[in-house]
Amino acid sequence: MKKTKIVCTIGPKTESEEMLSKMLDAGMNVMRLNFSHGDYAEHGQRIQNLRNVMSKTGKKAAILLDTKGPEIRTIKLEGGNDVSLKAGQTFTFTTDKSVVGNNEIVAVTYEGFTSDLSVGNTVLVDDGLIGMEVTAIEGNKVICKVLNNGDLGENKGVNLPGVSIALPALAEKDKQDLIFGCEQGVDFVAASFIRKRSDVVEIREHLKAHGGENIQIISKIENQEGLNNFDEILEASDGIMVARGDLGVEIPVEEVIFAQKMMIEKCIRARKVVITATQMLDSMIKNPRPTRAEAGDVANAILDGTDAVMLSGESAKGKYPLEAVSIMATICERTDRVMNSRLDYNNDSRKLRITEAVCRGAVETAEKLKAPLIVVATQGGKSARAVRKYFPDATILALTTNEVTARQLVLSKGVVSQLVKEINSTDDFYRLGKDVALQSGLAQKGDVVVMVSGALVPSGTTNTASVHVL
C-alpha cells in the first residue's frame, strides 16, 4: 500500500470529472490549483468537478490553493517580441512602468527595485536563464552587465539572489484569491515566497477575517531569506513546501538537495507536513517514461521523510498526466516498503510530552507485535501526526468527528482518515476502530492492532495506548 501522498496540479488536460476520477484511481491524494494561471470560473469548476467525483465514488482527496505570491516580473517589450541579449553588453532595468522595452532596457513591476539592490548584486531573469551583474544605480534605473547570451521576454520572473526585498507578503491578487479559497472551502493554502514569520501571520489573519480559520498554511520556501528564517517560519506554519524551482535559482543548485534534507528533517521533528515539489518527473511533460535520475529523485525525497511528492506541469499540461501519476505512485509504493521506523532508541534522551510519549510507545509496541494497524482517535489531527513522526510499518487509521481534520489528514504520510459521527467514550472508540479496521480491509480477523486515544474533548491529551485482537 502506498503511504507517501501525491499532490497533482490540475490544468486543462486533467480538469474533467472523468480524468479526475482516473487520477484518484492512479494515486492522486491532493488537487493543487495554481493561481498563477487560470481564473475563478476555471478553478471553481475544477473544485466542483472533484467534489462531484468524490460524492459519486466515495474517494477522498484534499484541495490545495497555491498563491501567485509576491514576485518581480518584466513588463512590456516593443511588439511583444523577445529580444536577444549578448554577454558583455549593458542592459538597464527601470521602475518607470510606462517604458516599452527593447534590447537595452525593460521596466519591472517592483517599485523598490532600485532601493533594494546594490552594485555587485546579481540579477537573474527567466528562471535564471539570463544572469546580470549590477554595475550602477541611477535614479529609477539599475544598470547591469549581461553575463551570458539569452532571449528576454515580457512577463518573465526576475530573481535577486541573496537580496532581502521589501515586497508585501500578500499582493492584491493574492488577497482576492484567498477570499475565493475561503468561499470555496479549500483545505490548504500553499503560500508562495514566504520570507519570514510575519508573512505567515499576515496570511493567517487574512484567512481568519474571511472565514478561513480552519485552512492550513503550507509555506513555500523559495529563496535564501526563507531558508535563513526557516525555524520561525516553520513554527508559524502548518506545513512546508520545498519549492525547488525558484529555490534552485536563488541559491546555488548544488545546495538545493541539502536544503531539502534540512527542511524535511525539521518538519518531521515538529510534526508538520512537508511536500517536496518541482521537476520531480519533469521529462514526462513530453515523454511517456521518466529518466532514471527523476525516479531516483522521487525515491530520495521519500527516504528523506517527505509526506508528499508533487507533480506540476506533468499533470497540468503534459502529454502523459495519468502515466505520470501511476509511475509516481509505483515509485512511492516501492520506496515506502523499505522505509524503516524512526524510533532512534539510542539517540533520543529528550523528555517527551505525554502525547508524544504515548504515540512513540504505540509505534514501538506495533513494531514489536508486527501489528498492521495503529488506530488513533484525533480531533485536530495532532495525535495522528505524532504517530506518523516515527514512520511505523503499520498503517495509521485516524478516526475523527471533524470533517476538516479528515480531509487535511489526507496529506499526511501513512495516514488513512475516517470520518465518524461521534465517539462518546473510550469503549465506543475501541468498538468503532475495530469495525472500521475490518470494513476497510486495513486489518483482518485475528490481527493485532494498537489503539491510541485520550481525553474525548476537542484537543484533549492523548494518554492511552492499548493492544487489541480483532
Swiss-Prot record:
CDD domains: Pyruvate_Kinase. It catalyses: pyruvate + ATP = phosphoenolpyruvate + ADP + H(+). Mg(2+) binds at E222, D246. K(+) binds at N34, S36, D66, T67. The record marks K220 as: Transition state stabilizer. Belongs to the pyruvate kinase family. Homotetramer. InterPro entries: Pyr_Knase, Pyrv/PenolPyrv_kinase-like_dom, Pyrv_kinase-like_dom_sf, Pyrv_Knase-like_insert_dom_sf, Pyrv_Knase_AS, Pyrv_Knase_brl, Pyrv_Knase_C, Pyrv_Knase_C_sf. ATP binds at N34, F35, S36, H37, R73, K156. Keywords: ATP-binding, Glycolysis, Kinase, Magnesium, Metal-binding, Nucleotide-binding, Potassium, Pyruvate, Transferase. It comes from Salmonella typhi. This is Pyruvate kinase I. PROSITE patterns: PYRUVATE_KINASE. Pathway: Carbohydrate degradation; glycolysis; pyruvate from D-glyceraldehyde 3-phosphate: step 5/5.
